[in-house]
């Protein structure tokens, strides 16, 4: 029986990917459809993807599939054909091609079975996820942006909104999608008579969010087809003004795609204009935050003097300090004061 998971170290895989001479294409896609046996589907897809040298992150659940991957350019069309013929529900599926791509977005293939393909926290048996809002294409998005009766809702996390968003879009401040859904309903009650336009990176979150809003009594709900990625691509192809400002955050090694020239965020350490996310170089912290080149040099890629000092310790001492330390997904959140004035490690209990 073939091995259906990776057995090579991350360092070795990353070095191998960086040494590759063939360009790669970064692709994202999702589909809500019923998968009777997610584990069986996962194992079959794993063999298809590994045969094509696909890297990336793929989640499967009874409700569908969610994938962010990179494919060797010479194998993109073969990948497309094999994906489309794998299951009738995937035939003709829209593939979002990265807007900015150095081909180094992923270096390992990870495929996991989960309860949901996007964690929504919804526990309501009467919720119909298929009753979604209407799609908006790029030209229609620009029309809606000029409609005083329309409200644009950003269904991404606060750190994504911070570096880029549509003009006058409403932020639903939260660290996770599951936190956003109830907040969105609460915040939009006063706009119940408006046209609600929801968007996210590639469409998966705003599609489900549009169904959740309709479930909660909102009748005029739209969502942007293919999210920010598809909107920007189609607007450029059609010669339309691109109304998204700043950078589109992405969940891979690139950390972002430049959409417009404006830099609307600031370094979390000195306040200089900057929209480049990074993870604290101290493995015992790994905080996600925005850091300008000057502060990266000053703090050696760390989020604080404390982490700088820890990074300078012998590796054995660093490992000892990391042992038993809570180190989940930590994110700098200015609005909630997750860090103190010295930008030390946030309280993991928060």
Curated annotation (Swiss-Prot):
EC number(s) given by UniProt: 1.14.-.-
Catalysis performed (reactions): uridine(34) in tRNA + AH2 + O2 = 5-hydroxyuridine(34) in tRNA + A + H2O
Ranges annotated as biased composition (Basic and acidic residues): 319-328
Top-level class of the enzyme under EC nomenclature: oxidoreductase
Positions of region (Disordered): 319-350
Active site, per annotation: 200 (cysteine persulfide intermediate)
Source organism, top-level taxon: Bacteria
Rhodanese domain boundaries: 146-240
UniProt xrefs under PROSITE patterns: RHODANESE_3 (PS50206)
UniProt KW keywords: Oxidoreductase, tRNA processing
GO MF annotation, one: oxidoreductase activity, acting on paired donors, with incorporation or reduction of molecular oxygen
InterPro entries, per the entry: Rhodanese-like_dom, Rhodanese-like_dom_sf, Rhodanese_C, TrhO, TRHO_N
Keyword flag Transferase: no
Pfam family name, one: UPF0176_N
Biological processes annotated in GO: tRNA modification
Role description: Catalyzes oxygen-dependent 5-hydroxyuridine (ho5U) modification at position 34 in tRNAs.
Family assignment from sequence similarity: Belongs to the TrhO family.
Protein name as annotated: tRNA uridine(34) hydroxylase
